[in-house]
A protein has these predicted regions:
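Core subunits and conserved enzymes of cellular information-processing
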Residues: 2-152
């Protein structure tokens, strides 16, 4: 009886850590995109960069402002399905939380460029993005996209 209570408490702590890391990483990622990446006109690797590139193409050539969340969720739909099928339900659900939350925050947070120096933006944007990915992996979740493929 006492062992079962301890296991439930440990599981609760583990889930709190998982979702705490997910929320923190999603928030920092959105801030990074709005303060560094977009300010420098950069397109990082992975689905984040592809999402920003598609947004830019829609805006430039068609005059349509497509939300970041919409493109990012559509791009991540296939890796999410693969994650559900082959990696695990808990991991995939927490990763979907990161994908959706970072997308929504990227759409909501106003753009606040810190600097326009491309070298500084590249260095700090990359460091912050790497920190967010590490934070997700520590919490046993991912930022979606190519992370699903790499883990599978």
């Amino acid at each position: 009886m006492g062992g079962s209570l301890i296991m439930k408490e440990l599981n609760l702590k583990h889930e709190a850590k998982r979702y705490g890391c997910a929320v923190l990483a999603a928030t920092i990622m959105a801030l990074n995109i709005k303060t560094f990446v977009r300010a420098g006109g950069l397109f990082p690797g992975g689905f984040t960069g592809l999402t920003l590139l598609l947004q830019n193409i829609f805006q430039t050539f068609m005059g349509i402002a497509v939300p970041y969340t919409l493109i990012n969720v559509l791009l991540n739909s296939i890796p999410v399905f693969i994650g559900l099928k082959f990696i695990g339900k808990k991991f995939t659900i927490s990763s979907v939380c990161v994908i959706v939350l970072s997308g929504l925050l990227t759409d909501i947070i106003p753009s606040q460029p810190i600097t326009y120096d491309t070298l500084l933006i590249s260095i700090f944007g990359g460091l912050i993005n790497g920190f967010c990915i590490s934070l997700c992996l520590i919490g046993n979740t991912s930022t979606g996209g190519t992370d699903f493929i790499a883990i599978y």
